Regions:
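Intrinsically disordered, low-complexity regulatory regions enriched in serine/threonine/proline
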Residues: 1-15, 27, 34-168
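Pyridoxal 5′-phosphate
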Residues: 20
Length: 168
């Protein structure tokens, strides 16, 4: 795990996770929290853009946030993680009871394929990248579903305040 990811996880421990705990989300990992009400489960999950950063046009630690519900009447699929006897579904396990959240901040800095972060591409991936870059709007724009985390970390606090407000 990179130092930047560790710093982001520390910041989450000081903002979002305590706020969610106050609302009954008592179990969590670094990027997922669960709330249990009988056999019903609520999920809040954060996903870093990661390896898709170049195509999305933002730094890899920029975040998407999903909320989901896993009601007792959904079939219990095999493969859903269990810890201490409790299901720990991810947002994608909760279909159709999931949604992506949208930020309230204006961040018109997304520029797909404006820089190549990983130069060690296989020839087939390089061709795929070139084809995608011709199809995707490469002008600067905003994305409502992704909190843009600047590489220098200067807007992490602002993003986490907005993210926490939107989640709650």
């Amino acid at each position: 795990m990179s130092d930047d990811a560790k710093a982001l996880n520390r910041a989450l421990r000081g903002t979002l996770w305590p706020a969610l705990k106050a609302h009954g989300f008592t179990f969590r990992t670094d990027r997922v929290a669960w709330r249990y009400a009988g056999d019903d489960i609520d999920v809040v999950e954060l996903q870093a853009v990661g390896q898709h950063a170049e195509a999305v046009g933002c730094p890899p630690l920029s975040l998407s946030v999903y909320v989901a519900a896993y009601p007792r009447f959904l079939p219990r699929e095999p493969g859903i993680p269990v810890r201490d006897g409790r299901l720990r579904p991810h947002y994608w396990d909760c279909d159709p009871f999931r949604r992506s959240l949208h930020k309230t901040l204006s961040q018109p800095w997304f520029r797909p394929f404006s820089e190549q972060r990983d130069r060690r591409l296989l020839p087939s991936l390089r061709l795929h990248r070139e084809a995608l870059s011709k199809l995707i709007d490469r002008t600067a724009h905003d994305r409502p579903d992704i909190w843009y985390m600047r590489d220098d970390g200067s807007n992490v606090d602002e993003n986490l305040r907005d993210l926490t407000t939107v989640v709650l």
